[in-house]
């Protein structure tokens, strides 16, 4: 049954406050007729610094056009939008703190102003999950429009992908690559706008938003510069008005079943390891506090790798788009999905994908023809990670599926990089980078260390990286991250010593510090650590003191 305007949030009366708002809106030039329309927030994370978001102002105009034509009043508001690639060098690292802030911004702006519905525009790593967390928290009609993937660059007559340029960082540092070639790759490997064209966190989160039903079908595999994505933005504006009138809210879309659908798709496409932080956080905001890492682990036993996309594979997101995109991917995965989940367009997952076509069955494979029987991601447990740790299995060299090595321990990313550059890390070492977790240092990424290690093939093909910090969505190699509990919480990771042996068995999903239980407990009793925060600004101190564990999604514990 269609809701009347009188029943909508923006029409609720608050006496003098209502008249004040009415007067202020009229003073800005809005008409009485416009003020009698449903009020729709266009939550636009556009800015001029983030290449994934620099074009969202154009998409927002199309969204607003659709809202107006469908009888609503669109009002554009903003949120923070930090580009992961712009802040990678800063060891403080602010992606996860910014994600939580973005969800808070959505709550305060949209709820405080009594909008009837919202369309949220975002593309990149922390912004898409922040917007989805805000949707789940407020539980009003909402659609997410993701900004599309970045066009491939061209260099010396060939298309190039950014991840291949990043692979050369270590070689350039050691003088093993021609500077002109390197600089040319850096200059031409990124297109004008959109999410970086591999399964980094940006594209991974866009795909998860679609997999859980919060975008219109096909959104996550559209080019940022295509006519299709502008058309979709307009249709999102039309559709949000239908959702407002029908009373369809975010928590009718974001359910335990739809989150499981997203996890299944994540396994099939080897999405970013950062999803193990974001999906549990979104679920929490919707009211579902399940042991989500165990769900990831269970799903890894039933969903193999079906699309071998970069960085671990050979195909770009553009290749994925041309092969049929997300609708085709989900159609072939339907036996592992809940096809009855509702999506924002009013149709079920099954209805949305039933007519999808696969144009390249090597890029989008079926369950009976996987790239590998292992999933994209895996959860490793053991005495070194009692609550779990995450590895991108699809990007691990085959010879490192079973590993045992001696620890080289570093209490910061800076210390690890100095040792690597000084030649103090040797073949087969287990490089332990700790106090980089959410409380220790805001979820610092070990991406820089990993990229420089990649420039030393002998080390890259024999060493392990083990950290309570995170990895970029472009992670590869034997890289175990998100070790939980983190070192700052007096965990087993905090008491690892140089030359301790560490064993990683990926098929068995285990990670083991090879010391006795008695020795481990004795070391833990002696360990003490306290966060001072004196070197950080106020918000980061606030984050460190109030954030929860990696395994629970890094949500506020307040």
Per-region residue spans from a language model:
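Catalytic or ion-coupling anion/metal-binding cores of large enzyme and transporter domains
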Residues: 1-54, 59-81, 85, 91-95, ...
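A short, small-residue-rich loop immediately preceding and capping a beta-strand
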Residues: 110-131, 143-146
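Glycine-rich, highly charged phosphate/nucleotide-binding loops
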Residues: 95-104
């Amino acid at each position: 049954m269609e809701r009347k305007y009188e029943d909508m949030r923006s029409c609720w009366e608050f006496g003098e406050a209502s008249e004040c708002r009415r007067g202020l809106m009229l003073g800005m030039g809005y008409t009485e007729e416009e003020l009698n329309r449903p009020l729709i927030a266009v939550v636009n994370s556009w800015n001029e610094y983030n290449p994934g978001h620099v074009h969202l102002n154009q998409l927002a105009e199309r969204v607003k056009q659709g809202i107006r034509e469908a009888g609503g009043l669109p009002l554009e508001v903003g949120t923070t939008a930090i580009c992961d690639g712009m802040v990678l060098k800063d060891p403080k690292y602010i992606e996860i703190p910014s994600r939580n802030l973005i969800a808070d911004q959505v709550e305060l702006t949209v709820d405080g102003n009594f909008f009837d519905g919202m369309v949220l525009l975002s593309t990149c790593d922390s912004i898409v999950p922040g917007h989805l967390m805000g949707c789940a928290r407020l539980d009003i009609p909402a659609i997410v429009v993701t900004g599309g993937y970045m066009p491939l660059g061209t260099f010396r007559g060939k298309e190039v992908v950014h991840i291949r340029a990043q692979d050369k960082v270590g070689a350039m540092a050691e003088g093993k690559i021609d500077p002109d070639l390197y600089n040319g790759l850096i200059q031409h490997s990124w297109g004008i706008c959109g999410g970086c064209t591999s399964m980094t966190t940006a594209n991974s989160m866009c795909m998860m938003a679609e997999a859980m039903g919060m975008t219109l079908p096909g959104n996550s595999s559209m080019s940022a510069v295509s006519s299709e994505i502008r058309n979709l933005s307009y249709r999102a504006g039309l559709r949000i008005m239908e959702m407002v009138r029908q009373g369809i809210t975010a928590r009718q879309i974001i359910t335990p079943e739809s989150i499981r659908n997203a996890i299944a798709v994540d396994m099939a496409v080897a999405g970013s390891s950062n999803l193990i932080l974001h999906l549990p956080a979104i679920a929490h905001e919707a009211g579902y506090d399940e042991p989500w890492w165990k769900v990831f682990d269970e799903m890894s036993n039933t969903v193999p790798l079906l699309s071998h996309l970069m960085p671990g594979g050979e195909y770009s997101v553009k290749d994925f788009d041309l092969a049929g995109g997300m609708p085709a991917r989900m159609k072939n995965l339907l036996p592992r999905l809940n096809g009855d989940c509702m999506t924002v367009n009013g149709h079920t997952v099954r209805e949305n994908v039933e007519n999808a076509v696969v144009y390249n069955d090597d890029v989008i494979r079926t369950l009976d023809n996987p790239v590998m029987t292992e999933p994209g991601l895996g959860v490793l447990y053991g005495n070194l990670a009692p609550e779990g740790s995450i590895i991108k299995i699809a990007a691990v060299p085959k010879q490192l599926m079973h590993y045992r090595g001696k620890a080289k321990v570093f209490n910061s990313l800076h210390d690890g990089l100095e040792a690597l550059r000084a030649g103090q890390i040797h073949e087969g070492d287990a490089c332990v980078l700790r106090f980089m977790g959410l409380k220790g240092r805001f979820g610092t990424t070990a991406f820089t260390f990993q990229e420089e290690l990649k420039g030393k093939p002998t080390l890259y093909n024999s060493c392990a990286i083990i950290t309570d910090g995170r990895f970029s969505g472009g992670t590869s190699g034997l890289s175990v991250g998100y070790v939980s509990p983190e070192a700052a919480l007096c965990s087993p990771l905090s008491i690892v010593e140089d030359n301790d042996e560490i064993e990683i068995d990926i098929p068995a999903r285990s990670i083991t510090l090879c010391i006795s239980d008695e020795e481990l407990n004795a070391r833990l009793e002696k360990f003490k650590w306290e966060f001072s925060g004196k070197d950080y600004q106020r918000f980061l101190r606030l984050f460190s003191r109030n954030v929860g564990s990696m395994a629970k999604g890094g949500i506020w514990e307040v």
